[in-house]
Amino acid sequence: MNIRFALDTIRGQLSGLKLSNEEYNFLITHLSPILLPDWFIKMLLDYPLIGVNFTLSEILDESDLGVDMEWLSPKQMVEEALEFYPGIVAIQLGYLPIGSCLIGSGDPYFLKMTLDNDDPSLVRIPHDILDENEKIDESEIEQVCFSLSHFFESCQID
């Protein structure tokens, strides 16, 4: 399944905001084009995801922790990527911050952006993952869903 099909099935439940032209310009000014593939920008322009709260049960979360996540605004994405850890290190590895944990940890959620994948996995990168050299051991990153489309198919929307 692809992301757009998955989003079309839940479109009526999405109560967030779509990406504005001003926010689009803000994103492309501050983040690398590699982190902002066309499919991702189009998704944010077409679907009101910004500010939506998504939940996923522990059973459906591949990390077995469960998800209670808010989809970040473009301003929050840029802040997480450029001003806060683990985002500062994660973007160097190709991870784009897209969500924040609402359960209490505040751990950010990311998509692994690569040129050849238009349905990346959704991962959680805990704040305490950085080693003493401020590096991330990618084997410690918590995979939540093997694809974003699968996450949209499996989640509940608050």
Question: Can you describe what each PLM-predicted range is?
Answer:
Residues M1, I157-D158:
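C-terminal end-of-chain micro-motif
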Residues M1-S105:
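A surface-exposed partner-binding patch
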Residues N2-L7, F110-D118:
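Phosphate-binding glycine-rich loops and adjacent basic patches that engage nucleotide phosphates
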Residues Y47, G99-G106, M113-N117, I125-L130:
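Short, flexible beta-strand-to-coil junctions
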Residues S63-G66, E70, Y109, S121, ...:
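Intrinsically disordered, low-complexity regions of eukaryotic proteins
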Residues W71, K75, P97, F110-M113, ...:
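A short, terminal or domain-edge coil/loop segment
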Residues G94, D118-S121:
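A short pocket-lining beta-strand/turn micro-motif at the edge of beta-sheets
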Residues S121-Q156:
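Compact, glycine/acidic-enriched structural inserts
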